[in-house]
Amino acid sequence: MDRLTVRELSPEENKVLVRVDFNVPIKDGKILDDIRIRSAMPTINYLLQKRAAVILMSHLGRPKGTGFEEKYSLQPVVEVLEGYLGHHVPLAPDCIGEVARQAVAQLSPGRVLLLENLRFHRGEEHPEEDPTFAAELSSYGDFYVNDAFGTSHRKHASVYHVPQAFPGRSAAGLLMEKELEFLGQHLLHSPKRPFTAILGGAKVSSKIGVIEALLSQVNNLLLAGGMGFTFLKALGKSVGNSLVEESGIELARRVLKLAEQRNVRIVLPIDVKVAKACEPGVSWSETLIDQGIPADLEGLDIGTKTIQEFCKIIDASATVFWNGPVGVYEVPPFDQGSMAIANCLARHSSATTVVGGGDAAAVVALAGCTSQVSHVSTGGGASLEFLENGFLPGTEVLSPAQD
């Protein structure tokens, strides 16, 4: 690590402002998966053992940024947090203003305070419009710790601007350190070979940077999901009514040419599950890509032959990175391809298997294989940006490590 870590701080009896990522899925006021809260506990517990007063700040969802919205309140997080800590955690009704300042002032060493959703204020996502937002957050702590790997690819106030107010006193949390070291060592600097990356999801354009970066790293690149259909169309295949990013077709051709130059094998679906609509109980069938998808049908998942081919390549790999589902996993049976990949990764215990957060992490959790994968990242977009650039905006602004 070339940045200061939380273990190098002296937080005793001081207030520590900690950016966590508690952006958890919530339904009817209940948290569906608390992995992000669980993942932050080592840093929180470490600071409490050091007798620090811990001020947690996070966003949740995408509120309008015009004030409190009940459905985006961090209130459901409090109960889970209290369960892990074993003591009461107050939730400040706001993250700035007099109520927040009072809550911070009353916080004792060895206790935790959670500030309300940062994104209730426009200044979080648009710091240039309201510089006072970052300035007020900065005033709460003696030290700053970033443990929100999943948000550190964004130049938001709490991630990018606040730490700059703590020269020599801003550090990476334990989760952040673990993410950067694992991804850096096993994917960027010295991956065991053969190295295979599997990319799903909808758009080529949003992943073009990481695709081009991976082409200088991997031996095999498996492409599926909506992105796969864009590549298939670029090769002149008939993809029917499947999701295609028309503006990405030229990008796909560029990638195919670059892969050839770099001797990287790109593998696309050879068959797909097709249906007239993506809805539960719909009639579906499997179609070979070479036979073409009929105009009134859309591809919604990879087919049996593609599953077999993808799993064969995974089994022969020493390092595997997966980001993005290969089908519409929320609607069975179009979850079969993604589930098969999750199970294949779990079985392949001799390889280093890395799941790049987001929907792929959700699939692995649904398949019950999270513990059998080498590393499930807490950041989808962040893991991709780290692979693309080798750094994240939110880590670059932390204090340099001391020699």
Curated annotation (Swiss-Prot):
E.C. number: 2.7.2.3
CDD domains xref list: Phosphoglycerate_kinase
Gene Ontology annotations for the cellular component aspect, listed alphabetically: cytosol
Cell compartment(s), UniProt: Cytoplasm
Residues in the signal sequence: none
Protein origin, superkingdom: Bacteria
A family per Pfam: PGK
InterPro entries, alphabetized: Phosphoglycerate_kinase (IPR001576), Phosphoglycerate_kinase_CS (IPR015911), Phosphoglycerate_kinase_N (IPR015824), Phosphoglycerate_kinase_sf (IPR036043)
Keyword Amino-acid biosynthesis: no
Entry annotated with the keyword ATP-binding: yes
Residues reported in the UniProt entry to bind ATP: 207, 299, 330, 357-360
The entry's keywords: ATP-binding, Cytoplasm, Glycolysis, Kinase, Nucleotide-binding, Transferase
GO BP: gluconeogenesis; glycolytic process
Positions with a binding annotation for substrate: 21-23, 36, 59-62, 119, 154
Subunit structure as annotated in this protein's UniProt entry: Monomer.
Membership in a protein family: Belongs to the phosphoglycerate kinase family.
Name the UniProt record assigns to this protein: Phosphoglycerate kinase
Organism: Chlamydia caviae (strain ATCC VR-813 / DSM 19441 / 03DC25 / GPIC) (Chlamydophila caviae)
